[in-house]
UniProtKB/Swiss-Prot annotation:
UniProt family annotation: Belongs to the UPF0758 family.
GO biological process: proteolysis
Keywords: Hydrolase, Metal-binding, Metalloprotease, Protease, Zinc
The protein's name: UPF0758 protein Amet_2289
Keyword field contains Repressor: no
Occurrences of domain MPN (ranges): 110-232
PANTHER family: DNA REPAIR PROTEIN RADC, UPF0758 PROTEIN YEES-RELATED
Organism taxonomic ancestry: Bacteria, Bacillati, Bacillota, Clostridia, Peptostreptococcales
Pfam family, one: UPF0758_N
Intervals of motif JAMM motif: 181-194
Length: 232
């Protein structure tokens, strides 16, 4: 029922105004945000076409498109017309966009200071609602090879084990690494556990010949460098 009504709604539109046809004829850059999201959603509901539903999703928050960047699946499902399937489609598209964006910025990005780490990862990590512990893998020139996630959730020594960190670094032939994690509270001040984990990883790195250059904690548009504060 929903699909047939969606098709009828689309068929009422002039051919050159239909999202898919616009994309094929003029390229994706010619589409509005609701039109792009409508293609991802594919179908609407009994009451709304895919474009109407996409507009509804984007207007759910004052932040609009930006809100989707760190939205949880449960939050999306609270929007009328969005079930688990459509929520999954949205999150998959958002995550793919994040990865493409990060990959394009990471390639040969050289780290010379904590500011460089912040410039690279602040926007990716400042709005995250859970703690993400990532490592930046560097070559001999301190250029970023990749950013790898090690754990998600509250940081503690049982989760962030040296083995999990350095097996990734060794596989990617990293000469050095930088630890990066976020504080969802927005306050980047390190906890006692943050400091203990850092020191443990620094010692493990010395044994393996892979230097831990810094541990950057990301807050809300502010960061804390344990190296700068002589805490490692």
């Amino acid at each position: 029922m929903g699909k047939s009504q969606y098709v009828t709604g689309i068929k009422k539109m002039p051919i050159n105004e239909r999202p898919r046809e616009k994309l094929l004829n003029y390229g994706p850059e010619s589409l509005s945000n609701p039109e792009l999201l409508a293609i991802i959603l594919s179908t609407g509901t009994k009451e709304m076409s895919a474009i109407d539903l996409a507009t509804h999703v984007l207007s759910y928050s004052e932040e609009g498109l930006r809100h989707l960047k760190n939205c949880e699946i449960e939050e999306l499902q609270q929007i009328k017309g969005v079930g688990i399937a459509k929520a999954s489609q949205i999150l998959a598209a958002v995550e793919l966009g994040k990865r493409i964006s990060l990959t394009s910025r990471v390639n040969h990005y050289r780290i010379k200071s904590p500011d460089d780490v912040s410039n690279l990862l602040m926007e990716e990590m400042r709005y995250l609602k859970k703690e993400y512990f990532n490592i930046a893998l560097l070559n001999t020139k301190h250029e970023v090879i990749a950013i790898e996630n090690i754990s998600i959730g509250s940081l503690n020594a049982s989760i962030v084990h040296p083995r999990e960190v350095f097996v990734v670094a060794i596989k990617r032939s990293s000469s050095a690494i930088i630890l990066v994690h976020n504080h969802p509270s927005g306050d980047p001040s390190p906890s006692g556990e943050d400091i203990r984990i850092t020191k443990r990883l620094v010692e493990a790195g010395k044994l393996l010949g892979i230097e831990v250059l810094d541990h950057i904690i990301i807050g809300d548009n502010v960061y804390y460098s344990l190296k700068e504060k002589s805490m490692m």
